[in-house]
Amino acid sequence: MVSRRNYAAITAVMVIIFFLFQFLNMAKDHWNDYSENQYAVDVNELSGADNVYVASDSDELDQQSTGLIPWAKKKCVVCIGSNESNTMGEMIGNWALYMKRKISYYESISAYENAISKKTQDTPQFVLVDPDFINWDDTKQIRSLQTCVENGISVIFGKLPDASIIESHKLLRRLLGIDEIVQESVTGNGIHLYSGFLLGGEAIYKADTDEEEKNQDMDLVFPWYHLTNGTKIYMKGMLEDSEIDVQKYPPLIWRKNFTTASVFAVIGDYMTDATGLGMLTAMLCEMQSYTVYPVVNAQNFIAANYPGMANENTAVLRQMYSQTMRGLFRDVVWPAFSSINIKTSFLLSSMMTMQFDYADAAKPNSDDVQYYMEAVNEEEGEMGYSVYSVSDTSVSEKLSEDEVFWKSTLPDYKFASFYVGESSDEEIQEALDSKFLQQIRTVVKGIDDTSDVIGYINNQVTKQNALIDGYEHTFRQNLRIRSVETALGYTSILADISRAAYPQSDEDGWEKLSEKLMANTITYWKPFSVFSGTTVSQSDSRIRRFLSLNYEEVANESNNKILIHASEGDETAWFVLRTNGEVISDVAGGTYEEIEDNVWLIGMEESSILITLKPSNTLFYYE
């Protein structure tokens, strides 16, 4: 039997616990100020397209004496064959912009040689060759590439000419490090990416199950070469025949070392889209004893067309989910997003569509706005705006209706981010010109194969391309993710909820979509968890800093010190440092965190930072 004293004590404890819970809920509601958007600012006060740094001959920073060696300008790069409008030429142009390098284009090797002889072209660090624009019948052009290597200029073949051309030119085979052409074409059953080239480690792109076969979108038909001594393979094809020595598998990406420079070869079309950004960066790192380069450091997760504020498509949703759209979004979809937020470093950028169908009778309900705004805010996410609709409604009509609803519901909240999907440039600009969206600072575009991953859509508004569909993860997409993470420290996952809201088949059911989404986001980005999870507006701030950044570096390798001096900015400047076995012992003026072996993320908190390295205790075997 409980005594009166114990009963009173138990009652008092229960009352205290009750009021504590009540107080916590009240405090949470009080502190959760969702009525105003912290990211919505006057975009004219932000760094704009006019501030983007483009490398030139006269680049100079406000330099001070280093006590090491004189500051040296970053070497330029050259593209032969492709121009800015070709896919490979466009890719290296974007790479040069992101890496703060000056780039020159030449239609032929002879045009490049002419510029060198007239001294109108500085000696580049490397030359990227697009073989589609080279006359291989002219052996003088091959000798010219050999001369480049002899003069200390590395040569990158963005892809290789046909095996028949290579077979007919002994000098070209010697330049590429090809000893024997085994077969002009062979069909493999997978591709092996070695560790230490792209960030993310080793990868085997081979389908061992029927389910994995759905992910196999790599080109598995390639020529088969045997290489000479002095070559290093970064990626190779895999063959079905188990009797073939693995060391003799067909190489797909490799380097041939010469005394003065290197020649890199790529088989396939990997250098024509964003995948090429990371591959060029990895090759640059292979040319140098250490490499420091700027990155964005932003990882985005975008829930496009979520939430919706109108109860639409009810008959279809009841049949598939036994739910209305309101129930689907609140009770089924939201828990999945909350779980991703907990289990990963991603922050949620939710792109609201107030209505999907403007032709039906359903209208948006203001009662749900508070729920979603509070929920997203509690997860430290951001609520943006989507222009998407399923009805034949013009952009101006949609904006007009949405503005009326929003002004009567949450008038003080101004949208700062804008999901445009596949909208045309004219439609995007029409929306940005509207009063309703006057504080938009960044636009999120749909998934595109272009290498133009980030940039400006107009003078004051940035653009961020979605890189990957969260509901699928093919082998080629995985390679693309690794490449963009290597080059930019950036990713952008897109989960379009309109598929679940307006399903076209059972494959669009949320149960199947969420299963894939959870597996993909939790699994494939683990190697890149050091990079920061951001909302798209936070990412926007980092993109502006990244694009406006100018920096210079100087090193005294005998003392294992690297000094970096950068242009000033409101945001932290982020860099990746890759070494050949050394590890960081100290960073004065900044922070550092290891991404993987020999790779660090550097945060630059002052205008100059000094990195001190030391030998690693790990044994390394050099080729």
Show the residue positions of the predicted features.
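Helical hinge/lid and interdomain linker segments adjacent to catalytic or ligand-binding clefts
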Residues: 81-163
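A glycine-centered loop/beta-turn motif at secondary-structure junctions
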Residues: 75, 123, 215-298
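Metal-dependent polysaccharide deacetylase catalytic core of the NodB/CE4 family, i.e.
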Residues: 77-81, 149-151, 157-180, 308-311, ...
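A glycine-rich, often tryptophan-bearing local segment used as a flexible ligand/cofactor-contacting loop or short
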Residues: 136-207
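Catalytic grooves of carbohydrate-active enzymes
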Residues: 268-269, 290-310, 341, 409-413, ...
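Active-site beta->alpha N-cap acidic-glycine motif
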Residues: 268-375
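C-terminal beta-strand-rich structural cap/linker in extracellular carbohydrate-active enzymes
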Residues: 139-140, 596-623
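Surface-exposed beta-strand/loop patches in extracellular or lumenal glycoproteins
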Residues: 214-224, 562-583
